[in-house]
């Protein structure tokens, strides 16, 4: 049957951090007394660094999978940097035009559809999705209505815990390798001017080093 090759882009991280170094000169002049003083304010630039892990994923589970097979797959993000972060996951699921069966054995018409399904966990919000011929893309923010701050050293809840291969009729995809790709993104929480998940995701996407 089908093999899954796991390609997890576990460090596609976005660093948007800055510091303004302010120089302040304070002078006071009097008729007979002159006093001058100056102060230089020093700032240290922090960083945003995240990592992704799937502690329960077993690559052997992805070998020779069968219809309706459920596999453990539990991506989560850890803030490895020095600054609070807002984080996102983008999941790309392979699609194909295939025929499937219902639980009672009846057949469905051939259709272009996702080859794997999953159920997202509490704490994550779907903010964007798209379907193409070869893949679907789902973008989740670590958020409720507003973004949730991920402090340094903290780890998110898992986005999902399992993936399920659809009930495909055999011999349609034999010998093919199927990839579920999970990209993770993080950005500083300060000075963004918004806490809207979609607006912040768009800020990340506007950075030149992030693939869209």
Name the predicted role of every residue range.
Residues 2-6, 14-16, 23-25, 32-212:
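Surface-exposed, hydrophilic segments of mature proteins
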């Amino acid at each position: 049957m089908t093999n899954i090759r796991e390609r997890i882009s576990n460090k596609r991280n976005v660093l948007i951090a800055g510091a303004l170094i302010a120089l302040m000169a304070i002078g006071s002049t009097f008729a007979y007394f002159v006093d001058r003083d100056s102060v230089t304010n020093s700032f240290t630039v922090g960083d945003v660094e995240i990592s992704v892990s799937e502690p329960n994923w077993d690559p052997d589970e992805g070998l020779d999978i069968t219809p309706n097979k459920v596999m453990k797959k539990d991506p989560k993000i850890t803030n490895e940097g020095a600054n609070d972060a807002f984080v996102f996951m983008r999941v790309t699921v392979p699609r194909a035009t295939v025929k499937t069966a219902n639980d009672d054995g009846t057949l469905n018409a051939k259709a272009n559809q996702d080859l794997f399904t999953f159920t997202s966990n509490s704490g994550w919000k779907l903010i964007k999705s798209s379907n193409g011929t070869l893949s679907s893309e789902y973008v989740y923010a670590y958020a409720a209505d507003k973004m949730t701050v991920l402090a340094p050293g903290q780890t998110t809840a898992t986005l999902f815990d399992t993936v399920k291969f659809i009930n495909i009729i055999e011999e349609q995809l034999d010998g093919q390798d199927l990839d579920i790709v999970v990209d993770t993104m993080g950005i500083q929480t300060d000075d963004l001017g918004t806490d809207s998940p979609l607006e912040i995701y768009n800020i990340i996407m506007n950075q030149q080093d992030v693939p869209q």
